[in-house]
């Protein structure tokens, strides 16, 4: 059951749900959390020491959110290595470093309203929900969207909503957004996403001339010319949609 009325679950109370009040957590989830807590803490330590993730709140989110819950049971033993893992429908869950870096680049706080494109199995959505006030996530594959929504609800997260449609169009009904994170690589920055970003807001997106490789880009929206930064090479599944790659194209 969700919170009454329009009450919002804060990041602190999500943390409480994960660890401080485990007596109210279903026994299956309680077991999963306890079993993988040490690998999760080691992963966060590597992110700080080897990958220079500096935001303490992002590192805490990576410690708290159970990545293994968002992959198949057969892959849970690999969930805390720094690599992407396959999920259904030829999609992937991003490597922890990329999740942490993209989240850090958004500069979130508890009042942030965030749009996520490419929710996949819901892991990045859960990380964002730990740090932000409200997260609206889009996943173009309907079954993945439904599964992601079910997972985050099962973990007691009520400040995130996942919907299935074309993410390159954004979700204007809940904008403008303080931050937008795109977890798929596109040929260009979709105009609707810029339009739905607040002035001063940040958009983090992989952009590349081919579907196979990209550069991680951060756009900071300004009144006139926007500030665009590059943050290194990356490789994501293609961003499919009206303002992305055509479905089935190779270029």
Language-model features, listed with the residues they occupy:
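Class I SAM-dependent transferase core
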Residues: 2, 9-115, 123-127, 131, ...
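Conserved nucleotide-cofactor-binding alpha/beta core module
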Residues: 107-227
């Amino acid at each position: 059951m969700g919170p009454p009325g329009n009450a919002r679950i804060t990041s602190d109370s999500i943390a409480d749900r994960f660890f401080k009040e485990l007596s109210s957590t279903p026994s299956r989830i309680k077991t999963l959390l306890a079993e993988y807590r040490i690998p999760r803490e080691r992963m966060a330590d590597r992110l700080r020491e080897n990958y220079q993730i500096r935001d303490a709140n992002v590192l805490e989110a990576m410690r708290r959110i159970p990545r293994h819950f968002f992959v198949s049971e057969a892959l849970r033993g690999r969930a805390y290595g720094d690599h992407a893992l396959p999920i259904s429908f030829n999609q992937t869950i991003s490597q922890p470093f990329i999740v942490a870096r993209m989240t850090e680049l958004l500069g979130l706080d508890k009042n942030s309203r965030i749009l996520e494109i490419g929710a996949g199995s819901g892991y990045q959505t859960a990380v964002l929900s730990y740090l932000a006030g409200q997260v609206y996530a889009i996943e173009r594959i309907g079954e993945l969207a439904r599964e992601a929504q079910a997972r985050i609800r099962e973990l007691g997260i009520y400040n995130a909503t996942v919907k299935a449609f074309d993410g390159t169009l954004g979700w204007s009904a809940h904008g403008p957004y303080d931050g937008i994170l795109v977890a798929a690589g596109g040929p260009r920055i979709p105009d609707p996403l810029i339009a739905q970003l607040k002035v001063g807001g940040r958009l983090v997106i992989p952009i590349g001339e081919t579907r196979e490789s990209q550069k991680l880009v951060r756009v900071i929206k300004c009144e006139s010319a926007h500030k665009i930064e590059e943050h290194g090479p990356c490789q994501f599944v293609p961003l499919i949609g009206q303002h992305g790659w055509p479905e089935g194209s190779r270029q």
